[in-house]
Amino acid sequence: MKMKKKRKDKKLSLKKIISMSAVTAVLCTSTLTPASITTETSTAKTLSTKEITATENPVTTKEPVTTKKPASTKKPTSAKKPTNTKKPTAAKKKKSNITKITISAAGDCTLGSDYKSPSSVNFYAKYNEKKNASYFFKNVKKIFKNDDLTLVNFEGTLTKRNTRAQKTFAFKGNPSYLKILQKGNVDAVSFANNHCRDYGEGSYQDTISVFKKNKMSYASYGKVSVYKTKGKKIGMIAVNGLEGVSSSEYYIKKGIQKLKKKKVNLIIVSMHAGIEKTSSINDVQKSIAHYAVQHGANLVLGHHPHTLQGIEKYKGAYIVYSLANFCFGGNTNPADKDTMIFQQTFTFKNKKLKKTKDVKIIPCKVSSSNSINNYQPTPAKGAAKKRIISKMNSFCKPYNLSFNKNGKLK
């Protein structure tokens, strides 16, 4: 019995040994097979590439962030605060901040007549014939509409008084005639001359009341005027040089002081001075005009001679010594019908007035008819235009100024 058991035990242990050897052999083979190494490496690569991919995605997304930090760092966009800093755009906006003010000036306007003038052809007759206030400035109203300020000399009175002054010529018109200026796009008047009291002191006050009632800007002796356009203030002073140089200088000095307190951007002085029916400029005109510029006037406009005179550039400002007649009811048929509209464009850059010579003249006739005064100022054409420009060039020659064939200052 014991022997059988031993044999059985031997058989069992042999089986164990054999199976263990087989297991060992299998284990050894499977561990050291090159195929199994490759698979593990692939898995490792797969894992590591996923890990890389996983880590690369953050890097990539962060790199947009980091590259977006160049984008933020590329604060060229913020650094496109060069765009703001590159305030050439802001500087270019300052260019669009340039303001141009065009002023048109014309001469003596008498809306009415002397009662001694021929009743069939005087101003009253023409007004009654046309029954239309737009008739008188019809041919120049577009010019005046396209500027920023139109200024004329108002010579006469708007009154119903009959207390005529003892003088050779005395002018008055119906107060309703003011609408002639309004329909013609006239914005302001100077009112300091030898005809503003033709029907007594009362007629002067009546006329001013008409201006005020109709909101017409006016300057007269000590009364200055401020006209606002395009965010700029234009100050106006009017003096009567026929009453003496010292009187004019007084009003100019006081007027400029008042206007400077009002912080105006431009100052225009209108002076009524000179000798009638001559192209010669006298010392009174020069003295008053130069004084005005020396004290701060940017432009001086003259009238009274009833004929054109030269233009001078003095210390950077233009002086127009005489603008002649314009819509002039004071003469039914003047021998000299030549006149003009003077225009100057002032340029402001960053609120500062630039030095420019943007000046032109528009040759005109006081009438659209050559044979009579029909009180309808009209731009000259063809030979008449050429002749008036040539005339002005001869008047301006002493001051070294001249105009081209279109009336533009050379």
Segments (PLM) and residue ranges:
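N-terminal Lys/Arg-rich, disordered targeting/topogenic segments
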Residues: 1-13
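Acidic, metal/ion-coordinating pockets
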Residues: 91-410
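Sec-dependent signal peptide cleavage junction
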Residues: 29-47
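Generic short N-terminal amphipathic or hydrophobic helices
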Residues: 16-17, 36-38, 51
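Sec-dependent N-terminal signal peptides
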Residues: 12-30
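Ser/Thr/Gly/Pro-rich low-complexity, disordered linker/stalk segments of secreted
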Residues: 47, 51-95
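Acidic, serine/threonine-rich low-complexity intrinsically disordered regions
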Residues: 1-3, 41-43, 66
